Regions:
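Conserved ABC ATPase signature
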Residues: 57-61
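Hydrophobic anchor residue at the start of the ABC signature
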Residues: 71
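H-loop/switch region of ABC-family ATPase nucleotide-binding domains
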Residues: 117-118
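Conserved ABC ATPase "signature" region
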Residues: 27, 38-53
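Helix N-cap at the start of a conserved alpha-helix in ABC-type nucleotide-binding domains
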Residues: 93-94
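Catalytic Walker B motif of ABC-type/P-loop ATPase nucleotide-binding domains
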Residues: 82-86
């Protein structure tokens, strides 16, 4: 892995520019690196299930749609390291399944994924190692066999 690695980050409550569409928000982020073209943006919007809402203003997005856009922003540059804070927060059943599949795809691509999640079943499904942290201290660590 290169250092510093290409990193994608999803914070628990992602925020974007309200008067811009989902597509425009991603295009603005993409302009920072200059390595992401419109086809890549459209592809990532398809992966997270926002193709039909790409031109809709962000302020009109539901909480789940905002979360999906945050996931799209985190993965659109094909990071080596992906840090996800509660990636399934505010998602419906389809959104949770889609997000789990995206995380699997990223891991299969060789991405190191670090995530927080309160849903133990999701962690057990997706993670090789699980750490329970209480008051800043690792209480239990478990590994998939």
């Amino acid at each position: 892995m290169d250092f510093p690695p290409k990193m994608g980050v999803l914070i628990e409550n992602p925020a974007f520019l309200g008067n811009y569409s989902g597509y425009e928000n991603l295009r603005l982020l993409a302009s920072i690196s200059g390595k992401i073209n419109s086809d890549m943006i459209e592809d990532v919007l398809e992966r997270v299930g926002l193709s039909d809402s790409a031109k809709k203003k962000y302020r009109k997005y539901s909480l789940g749609m905002k979360q999906r856009l945050g996931i799209a922003a985190a993965i659109m540059e094909k990071p080596n390291l992906l840090i996800l804070d509660e990636p399934t927060n505010a998602l419906d059943t389809d959104g949770v399944q889609r997000t789990k599949e995206i995380i699997r795809e990223e891991r299969n691509r060789g991405t190191l994924v670090i995530m927080t999640c309160h849903d133990r079943a999701i962690l057990e499904d997706l993670c090789d190692e699980i750490f329970n942290i209480e008051h800043g201290t690792v209480m239990i660590a478990s590994t998939k066999d």
